[in-house]
Amino acid sequence: GLGDVYKRQRAKSYLSEALLHSFAESKKNHVDFYRRYLTRVSLDLGEDLYKNVTTDKRVENFKETHDAHLVATYFQFGRYLLICSSQPGGQPANLQGIWNDKLFPSWDSKYTCNINLEMNYWPSEVTNLSELNEPFFRLIKEVSESGKETAKVMYGANGWVLHHNTDIWRITGALDKAPSGMWPSGGAWLCRHLWEHYLYTGDIEFLRSIYPILKESGLFFDEIMVKEPVHNWLIVCPSNSPENVHSGSNGKATTAAGCTMDNQLIFDLWTAIILASQILNTCLLYTSDAADDSLRV
């Protein structure tokens, strides 16, 4: 079919372009490309005492040697993986990495938003790979749009919602089983990464561009949270502590109300909204509501 013809043509174009350059030139371009990222940060944990030992043996012997230089190497390996799998213009780093070789990979190679996707990007700002957030931030922008329909249909609410998974089509609804799927706070966690990018860069124009995403996520929680009857706290219900069970439930109960994780994520989100609105001098009425709500979480 036409699709196969296109794939062959595209593959040939890549090969033709590659063959225009010698091996030495291609290797130099490759090394230079990675070096400009990797050399921004170094981690010195002392002398390399095992430099004549192969890496597989160093890993095998780590319990006995406590090989500090291997730890520093592993630190850079983590940065290398993000450099490989999150180049601007592409897709974000997923559960399996860019070189997955299976038609049906584990967990569908999706984006799991109840910690995995966030963990992939924890090193981005603190290890000076800030621009590699671009695919991730584009995903957040896209789920903030698709999540508006989910918020309206599932919860009758304004704003946007994301549950524990999304994919290349930017799904946002609850899926899989209750211990993981019935968790509507993925959007709040992703918003934290937008706010942290501003904290690291001080980029006012970036903050201005993502403020509506923060605000609409906060609006969703403002509309769906309910009062806890004893203390009059605002809580998310139903929800869960992702992939966790309640103590005392014999490992059976998962769906809950007012989970600590939700409380912290939403308090953090509203705090970011309040601070951002003060910096941008905007939405003061909404900010007042958010400040009141945050005190009741």
Residue ranges and their predicted role:
Residues 81-84, 117-130, 188, 194-203:
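Alpha-helical support elements that line or immediately flank enzyme active sites
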Residues 4-8, 94-110, 158-207, 222-284:
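The feature captures the catalytic groove of carbohydrate-active enzymes
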Residues 82-86, 138-151, 213-228, 288:
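Long, well-ordered core segments of solenoidal/helical folds
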Residues 76-79, 89, 211, 215-219, ...:
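Acidic, mature catalytic/reactive cores of soluble proteins
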Residues 4-111, 130-134, 140-150, 281:
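Acidic/polar, glycine-enriched structural segments that form the non-catalytic walls/loops
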